[in-house]
Amino acid sequence: NHKIGVTNQGANVANGKVTLVETNGGNAAFSLTNPNNRVDLGAYQYFLAKEGNNWVLANSKNAVTPTPPVAPVTPNKPVVTPSKPVVTPNKPVVTPTAPVLPSTPLLSDLANAQVSLRQAQLLLVEDNLSGIHQRLGEVKNGEKGNVWARNVNSRQKLAALSTGESETSGFKQNVHSLQVGADAAVTDNLRLGGFVGRSQANVDFNGDYGDGKVRSNSVGLYAAYLADNGIYVDNIVKYSRLHANSDLTEKRHYNAYTISSELGKRFNLVNDWTITPQAQLAWTHISSQENEDSLSSVYSRIGLRVAKGFALSNGWNLQPYAAVNAITSKNRSSKIHYANS
């Protein structure tokens, strides 16, 4: 039995396999000393497998040429000559169990982390698309200026993403965001303002793929028009500086630009109840980095918000609300490029 240690130095791998050992036969067996009995080469994981008389690194069953079946032999009638058996104990031979090759290639730790972090970046930017009600509340008190703060903590779960021949592990992330801003009334119906924000997403890749982080520092401007009949239009432009890294990737920096527009109308009901249908459309662009294409997406949301106002004895107003939203996010085919993929 023999042990092989493999170091990835960027050599090209053709057709999903590379031959490590060539033999003319024999019963020699080989196994890897690498952790988990596998090697990450470019986008995929590779395992040691026997192909005929040779031993190869392969990323799936389809990459290995199957051994042709042995033609059947017609047995002859045996001639048995009884003899006294001689029992000679043999030293047991322990053959290491070869790993079972996957049916389709599995993403390498590096590829899974980079693709998943790219998703996490877009999620974090879109998660901070604050609607007018989240940012300003029910602005109908006629005040000339407002200062506001918004803290959001959420947990998101993404299923596996198809990447062509393979798929990601999927991931969960905990998002913590803080935004602080101020605005002033230009007219009775128009308000202009700005804000700064800081966010972090702690990303947990499913399976044995480890963890990652995405951080964001952002600054933005907005203009909100609120008509007397309850119709409002809210426009936001925002710049974000993103930082992403994981257990297996170095820290990378990105620039993200977002334009968002929201339209809605508030209907006043009895006893300080209000109902507000609303729609939002946003565009986001995240810059490229080394082997990563730039990423652009269109985010759309339609929703309904129901609120109830309470006037407190100290002059404060309390307004709990509930909202339901349908959200879609469409992006073009942004790619991450690897050798051997």
Residue ranges and their predicted role:
Residues 1, 7, 51-52, 91, ...:
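Membrane translocator/pore-forming domains, dominated by Gram-negative outer-membrane beta-barrels
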Residues 5-188, 254:
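Outer-membrane translocation/initiation segment of Type V secreted surface proteins
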